[in-house]
Amino acid sequence: MRESLVAILVTVISVLGAIHQVKSHEDQPLSGIAVHKITFGLNEKAYVKASPTVLGSNGQHSELVLVQYSSPKPSDDDWIGVFSPADFNASTCPGDNKMVQPPRLCSAPVKFQYANFSNPRYTNTGTGSLKLQLINQRSDFSFALFSGGLLNPKLVAISNKVAFENPNAPVYPRLALGKEWDEMTVTWTSGYGLNLAEPVVEWGVKGGERKLSPAGTLTFARNSMCGAPARTVGWRDPGYIHTAFLKELWPNSKYTYRVGHRLSNGALIWSKEYQFKSSPFPGQNSVQQVVIFGDMGKAEVDGSSEYNDFQRASLNTTKQLIKDLKKTDAVFHIGDICYANGYLSQWDQFIAQIEPIASTVPYMIASGNHERVWPNSGSFYEGLDSGGECGVPAETMFYVPAQNRAKVWYSSDYGMFRFCVADTEHDWREGTEQYNFIEHCLASVDRQKQPWLIFLAHRVLGYSSTYFYAEEGSFAEPMGRESLQKLWQKYKVDIAIYGHAHNYERTCPVYQSVCTSHEKSNYKAPLNGTIHIVAGGGGAGLAEFSDLQPNWSLFRDYDYGFLKLTAIDHSNLLFEYKKSSDGRVHDSFTISKDYRDILACAVDSCPATTLAS
């Protein structure tokens, strides 16, 4: 037994010892563990014990584990690392993880916490305990005690194994709008490959007959990643991602569903039951409420993984969205989704965090730099922001109604809204495939039925006075407005919303950097320009504004928050900015217009005419 434990410990050291050789983006807490100075310090008087050993006995997919530990030489910088899979065997490491010299790497810790977190007297007593939340991630777990802090860790002891009763169970369903207005998609994750079970959804109108619909299955392998850490230290098997298409839905109706798998012996494994409300018919005159934000990320409710506080506010945003869920019809998370940055275990933790939201209302995404950017991968920008993911996890974990899911631009109709979602990680300039899509999306909407035309993108293509855009001198992505403002103006886009800059900012209705209205809160059409919003305060660390506040910048807030658009009817729209800390409205405006206002000419918004015409 002891020889086996020592072998595991030695291999854990190998795992950690290689992490320093691959640098991830500084935003990822796990990348802060500088373990290149690690030493082996197994101590017979030290121990780590975890209980219960079997989780999810009542069907739950997250559970608190009590971790008790003791060290004969305690220190304030001792910490507990959580590992999954629990065993670390160097013989299982893939070939492309060979290091110049031993040790070799298998996988990174899932999360960590300091040993004195719940016991300030840890250095006196040498004992402590933590309650750590684990989620079902398709494998078992173990817990390791380290001394020496994050910068000079010494492995002291490792625990028994802990596992969920059914690690393959279907978990974390997430809804998305389909390509047709009467279609809803449901995506979930499991450990069941097609060789083990067939994925199915049981669904129907609430209180009515239910039917079974099949689901497609996707996954991806390590060699689908573009670089480290996603391809090396951060790699973790994503399991299987299943998507079913629920079609011919009645408008504005409540449906119930559950996801599951039919095993080879005919037995069915089911999730718990969920419900959603289907979309209204395009143009249907009913109150419709949509939430929009970017750059949220994830955080641990047990306080772990806190090398920094970069995304702690994401829990506040999530909490407020859940609190207001009954008054929300759809959510758009416009890029920088979970900041996994190549540590793939974080994707499971993110979809678990948003499950109460995404299982109830459509959770639509846009592509951000932290999902897509990687050198020589076809992204519009160069950089290491995705940690080697190059878009693959995001494009697989979440369904979007795009023609090509590797090019995350698409249109979505919800009642009186038309959303045109751009992909700023691919070229959007005039003459490109995406530019043609954007124009088609804006031009093809019937504004008599869907008067509210909203443009969404991750990077700021319009206006922002965030310091890094001010330093560019463009107050936006270079080439952003240059290519697109004539489309916004021509097709009378009401509001354009972006993330990327981690703050909140609202402009006046603006065209070519000039305000086209001096009103600030109650707009009456025609606006003769587009209102631009930065909503990048979903939860990731905030970004400062420049000292200069341009004339077009009406409202700036250095805080976390999200937007809510309410289409009251075809003539009235309410815009609200709510803070994540309290859920209260801190900025708002209304737009009132009639169909004739959309038809009327404004500067550069009508076809050219001649004397002959």
From Swiss-Prot:
Q: Which Pfam families match?
A: fn3_PAP, Metallophos, Metallophos_C, Pur_ac_phosph_N
> Which SUPFAM superfamilies does its entry note?
Metallo-dependent phosphatases, Purple acid phosphatase, N-terminal domain
Q: Where is the signal peptide?
A: 1-24
Cofactor(s) of this protein: Fe cation; Zn(2+)
Kindly state one GO CC term assigned in the UniProt record: extracellular region
Q: Where does Zn(2+) bind?
A: 336, 369, 458, 500
Q: Which residues are substrate-binding?
A: 369, 500-502
Tissue specificity of this protein: Expressed in roots, stems, leaves, flowers and siliques.
The cofactor note reads:
Binds 1 Fe cation per subunit. Binds 1 zinc ion per subunit.
What positions does the entry give for Fe cation binding?
Answer: 295, 336, 339, 502
Keywords for this protein = Glycoprotein, Iron, Metal-binding, Secreted, Signal, Zinc
GO MF annotation, one: acid phosphatase activity
Q: Where in the cell is it found?
A: Secreted
InterPro entries (UniProt xref) = Calcineurin-like_PHP_ApaH, Fn3_PAP, Metallo-depent_PP-like, MPP_PAP, Purple_acid_Pase-like_N, Purple_acid_Pase_N, Purple_acid_PPase_C_dom
Report the main location listed first in the record: secreted
Where on this protein are sugars attached?
89, 116, 316, 528, 551
Q: How does it assemble?
A: Homodimer.
Family statement drawn from the similarity comment of this UniProt entry: Belongs to the metallophosphoesterase superfamily. Purple acid phosphatase family.
**What name has this protein been given in UniProt?**
Probable inactive purple acid phosphatase 1
